[in-house]
Amino acid sequence: MFVVGATNPAIRMLGPVYGKDSGFTQLEIGIFLSLALIGGVAAQIPIGYLADRFDRRKVLITLSFLSIICSATLIIVSGDNFYIFSIFVFLFSFFALPLFSIAAAHANDFSEKEFFVDLAVSLIFVYGVSAILCTVIVSSLFEIFGSGVLFIYIGIVHLILCVFGAYRMTIRPTVEDKKPYLAFPRTSFVFLKMFKKSKSD
């Protein structure tokens, strides 16, 4: 969760600086920041489906690795071809933004039901602290190396996540019993209970 907080907020908070230094117009900066969110929205159901059918750590590592590839591509094409840049911003968002949800689900897999709320609070706290630290760290790197370091930083942090995830897989088994992924809108408590009852029947 710390790694997720140390990467995803960097684009939202310092993306405008990166875009301006890369020579983007104001419209292009707006498109850049929009795509950095749209990809994550588009990924929720398909990535959630995969995370509920495979080891969540494998999904985390795979998505993080794909985020590294997108980051490397964005480093190469930045400022040269905005259309290609936009495609890979969308893809980066598609792979990187669901990491928060999957990491939270993975943590819940090893938690008792009575600790779910405490766990959620802890995860959000860790995410918030890492997001604050990432803003300070990345802005400091901007001062030293320039804004082009943004996706280098993001790629390195995702690499750390890949290595750590692979290490954790060697020392802790996966959770085998998983409920099938089911997408339904948020609604009233009464309807939610009826919905669960109908599914159990």
Segments predicted by a language model, with ranges:
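Helix-loop boundary and gating motifs at the non-cytosolic
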Residues: G5-T25, I29
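Loop-to-transmembrane helix entry/capping segments in MFS-fold secondary transporters
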Residues: Q26-L27, S111-L123
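Transmembrane alpha-helical segments of major facilitator superfamily
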Residues: F32-G40, Y127
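Helix-to-loop junctions at the C-terminal end of transmembrane segments
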Residues: A43-D55, F142-E143
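Structural signature of the two symmetry-related core transmembrane helices
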Residues: K58-T73, G155
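Intracellular juxtamembrane helix-capping segments at the cytosolic ends
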Residues: L97-S111
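A membrane-interface helix-boundary motif in multi-pass transporters
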Residues: S140-H158
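Intrinsic disorder in cytosolic terminal tails and internal cytosolic loops
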Residues: R168-D201
